[in-house]
């Protein structure tokens, strides 16, 4: 083994197995691109993004850690989101929750 080497299985690695997921259509009504990161509480994303905010409270994008999705101006696309896990407490971001989700 080489220091820092990561040995992974030959098979695909599934993300977020067993967690609740939703598909939501998101439109960028703004005049600039908007990028949302993998672990950002989607409910608190930029207000220029139009989608059912109450339906996505407690969810984040279902993409690999450290990646993001970019929404171009005028673009509408369907994305998959996944329920937050752990204590299900949200602090920071846009400051709209600042506590327990459930």
From Swiss-Prot:
Enzyme Commission number: 3.5.1.5
Enzyme class: hydrolase
Reactions that this protein is recorded to catalyse: urea + 2 H2O + H(+) = hydrogencarbonate + 2 NH4(+)
Keywords: Cytoplasm, Hydrolase
Coiled coil is among the record's keywords: no
Family designation: Belongs to the urease beta subunit family.
Keyword Zinc-finger: no
The organism's taxonomic lineage, starting at the top: Bacteria, Pseudomonadati, Pseudomonadota, Gammaproteobacteria, Moraxellales
Protein's cellular compartments: Cytoplasm
Main localization of the protein described in the UniProt heading: cytoplasm
Name of the protein: Urease subunit beta
One Pfam family hit: Urease_beta
Gene name per UniProt: ureB
GO CC field: urease complex
């Amino acid at each position: 083994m080489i220091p820092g080497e990561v040995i992974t299985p030959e098979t695909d690695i599934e993300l977020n197995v067993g967690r609740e997921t939703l598909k939501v259509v998101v439109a960028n009504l703004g005049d600039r691109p908007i990028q949302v990161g993998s672990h950002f509480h989607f409910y608190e994303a930029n207000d220029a993004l139009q989608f059912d905010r109450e339906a996505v409270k407690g969810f984040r994008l279902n993409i690999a850690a450290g990646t993001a999705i970019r929404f171009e101006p005028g673009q509408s696309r369907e994305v998959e989101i996944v329920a937050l896990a752990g204590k299900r407490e949200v602090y920071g971001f846009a400051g709209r929750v600042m506590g327990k989700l459930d």
